[in-house]
């Protein structure tokens, strides 16, 4: 449930006039005091009656000045400090129905009033508000008024200028695969969605010699990888199916290949985006590195659409391994598998990917029939991608992996012998989420899924994932774990019905607490969205979040871009 109670106080945008009024009242009070003092020793003086009236006026005026002065100090505390505390803000003010109707005419004009470029159909509004696999769902009234399909960066800019002028909340949308309520329309009644996936979905230019590619924000990452594959290249990140480049940037995605190729933060050269007021900004040119000015890429990556809307980006490409195989290694316990992964990292073994699936996950994959193979060993399993410039290099790495795995009690070591078996073996990892959903719904058609993630330092990975596994097993719910073991990041899949929601919440809460206590993070790659705002506070503290809020207010003072995500922007927001 996501509610706000009431609206109070002055709007921030009224602060300039407020300060003028306060200064005027203070100047008047000073002038009165000066006038009284200069005439106080004059023989005639004021009569007691006049002094009484004047005194009462000054007391009344003083009360007003005090009240305005208190508000002035509140405004001053926001503007003069390096942070923006929630309690120092007033609630954002968005446009009313009448104003929105006027704005809607202008928004449609930008899109040439072509019904192909916008929609108000109920199914489309629903699809842009929630998904069945989201961990946090919109309420029935939380729907946008319209979904807009801009055709290019200039359209996005023009639409945002109108939304900024009329104070209309804007939800950026691309693939719609995020899991923490990132695109919930928390401000219904005057909210619009800007969906870039319909038109801004082109691969613009491959600079093969420089190992980068220029793409629009609505390009699906799988489509980009297929294109790059023909050139012997790949996109380093591999998030969930359906994710698009703008969303990958907004959520700072990573995926199974991050161990070798890095997360989105390491794979973006530059970003073209539209700010809240419609200003078009390109973060930098196309060098592999730069120390010129602020790192705007780093600011925007992971900002979840709260600071700007990404329309185009230059992305790093990586040379594909000449040879690559997949190995599958089961272990008796999650602790054994996790300890093996940490040992491999600390030994400096070069792998393209290293993934951990627990015994429940392996059982679910067998039951789901989602892969061509249905006799997986149903115990915690590590999946490896091993690549190199020659078969000899791969064989040497396999021997090293086998040696370390044997020290952690592995029960089997299977590796691909050809391209088909390689795809078959890795397929189990990529269908994990969907296998869990399908299995849960076969058991209970009304089942919900809670998918969440944390990340911890490598040395803490085994302890944290093992403790989480024990709690999940004891819960009585259908649960499974999947880990990007190479970077200490793991995911929990929890199937529950409405009556079991509290149990699921407790599992997630304890999982996050363990991660933070282990000097980790509440989310390694899913992002904060609505679902983890309180956990972010626990992780980094009030003042650090207040710095983030200050940046938000500086770049989006009307708070129209994806409001209420990552942290609270409204003191009347009482959702936890």
UniProtKB/Swiss-Prot annotation:
Function: Catalyzes the stereospecific oxidation of D-lactate to pyruvate.
A Pfam family matched in the record: FAD_binding_4
Biological processes, Gene Ontology terms: lactate catabolic process
Keywords associated with the record: FAD, Flavoprotein, Mitochondrion, Oxidoreductase, Transit peptide, Zinc
Cofactors (names): FAD; Zn(2+)
Listed name of the protein: D-lactate dehydrogenase [cytochrome], mitochondrial
Domain FAD-binding PCMH-type: 139-320
Gene: DLD1
Organism: Kluyveromyces lactis (strain ATCC 8585 / CBS 2359 / DSM 70799 / NBRC 1267 / NRRL Y-1140 / WM37)
InterPro entries reported for this sequence: FAD-bd_oxidored_4_C (IPR004113), FAD-bd_PCMH (IPR016166), FAD-bd_PCMH-like_sf (IPR036318), FAD-bd_PCMH_sub2 (IPR016169), FAD-linked_Oxase-like_C (IPR016164), Oxid_FAD_bind_N (IPR006094), Vanillyl_alc_oxidase_C-sub2 (IPR016171)
Domain of life from the UniProt record: Eukaryota
Cofactor binding, per record: Binds 2 FAD. Binds 4 to 6 Zn(2+) ions.
GO molecular function: D-lactate dehydrogenase (cytochrome) activity; D-lactate dehydrogenase activity; FAD binding
Subcellular location(s) per record: Mitochondrion matrix
Catalytic activity: (R)-lactate + 2 Fe(III)-[cytochrome c] = 2 Fe(II)-[cytochrome c] + pyruvate + 2 H(+)
């Amino acid at each position: 449930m996501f509610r706000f109670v009431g609206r109070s106080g002055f709007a921030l945008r009224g602060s300039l006039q407020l300060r003028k009024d306060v200064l005027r009242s203070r100047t008047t009070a000073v002038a009165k005091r000066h006038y009284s003092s200069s005439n106080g020793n004059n023989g005639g003086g004021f009569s007691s009656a006049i002094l009484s009236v004047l005194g009462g006026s000054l007391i009344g005026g003083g009360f007003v000045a005090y009240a305005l002065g208190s508000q002035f100090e509140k405004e001053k505390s926001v503007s003069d400090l390096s942070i923006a505390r929630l309690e120092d803000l007033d609630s954002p003010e968005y446009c009313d129905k009448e104003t929105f109707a006027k704005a809607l005419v202008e928004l449609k004009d930008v899109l040439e009033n072509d019904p192909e470029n916008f929609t108000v159909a109920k199914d489309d509004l629903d699809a842009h508000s929630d998904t069945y696999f989201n961990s946090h769902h919109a309420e029935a009234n939380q729907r946008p008024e319209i979904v807009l399909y801009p055709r290019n960066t200039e359209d996005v800019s023009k639409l945002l200028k109108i939304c900024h002028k009329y104070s209309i909340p804007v939800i950026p949308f691309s693939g719609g695969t995020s899991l923490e309520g990132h695109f919930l329309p928390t401000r219904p009644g005057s909210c619009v969605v800007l969906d870039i996936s319909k038109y801004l979905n082109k691969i613009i230019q491959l600079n093969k010699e420089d190992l980068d590619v220029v793409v629009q924000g609505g390009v699906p990452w799988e489509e980009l990888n297929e294109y790059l594959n023909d050139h012997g290249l790949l996109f380093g990140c591999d998030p969930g199916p359906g994710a698009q480049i703008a969303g990958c940037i907004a959520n700072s995605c990573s995926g199974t290949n991050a161990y070798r190729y890095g997360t989105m933060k390491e794979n973006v050269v530059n970003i073209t985006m539209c700010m809240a007021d419609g200003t078009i900004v390109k973060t930098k040119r196309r060098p592999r590195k730069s120390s010129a000015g602020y790192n705007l890429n780093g600011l925007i990556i992971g900002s979840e659409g709260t600071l700007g809307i990404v329309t185009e980006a230059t992305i790093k490409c990586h040379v594909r391994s000449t040879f690559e195989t997949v190995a599958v290694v089961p272990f008796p316990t999650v602790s054994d598998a996790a300890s093996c992964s940490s040992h491999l990292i600390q030994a400096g073994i070069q792998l393209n990917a290293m993934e951990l699936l627990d015994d429940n996950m392996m059982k679910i994959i067998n039951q789901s029939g989602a892969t061509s193979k249905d006799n997986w060993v149903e115990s915690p399993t590590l999946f490896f991608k091993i690549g190199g410039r020659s078969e000899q290099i791969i064989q040497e790495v396999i021997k090293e992996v086998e040696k370390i795995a044997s020290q952690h009690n592995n029960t089997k070591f299977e590796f691909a012998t050809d391209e088909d078996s390689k795809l078959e073996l890795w397929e189990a990892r990529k269908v994990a989420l969907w296998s869990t959903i399908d299995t849960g719904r076969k058991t209970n058609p009304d089942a919900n899924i809670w998918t969440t993630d944390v990340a911890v330092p490598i040395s803490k990975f085994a302890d944290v994932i093992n403790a989480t596994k024990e709690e999940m097993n004891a819960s009585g719910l259908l649960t499974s774990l999947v880990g990007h073991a190479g970077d200490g990041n793991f995911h929990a899949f929890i199937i529950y019905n409405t009556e079991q929601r509290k149990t699921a919440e407790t599992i997630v809460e304890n999982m996050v607490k363990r991660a933070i206590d282990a000097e980790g993070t509440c989310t390694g790659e899913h992002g904060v969205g609505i679902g983890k705002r309180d956990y972010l506070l626990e992780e980094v503290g009030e003042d650090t979040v207040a710095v983030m809020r200050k940046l938000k207010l500086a770049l989006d003072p009307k708070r129209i871009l994806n409001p209420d995500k990552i942290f609270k922007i409204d003191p009347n927001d009482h959702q936890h």
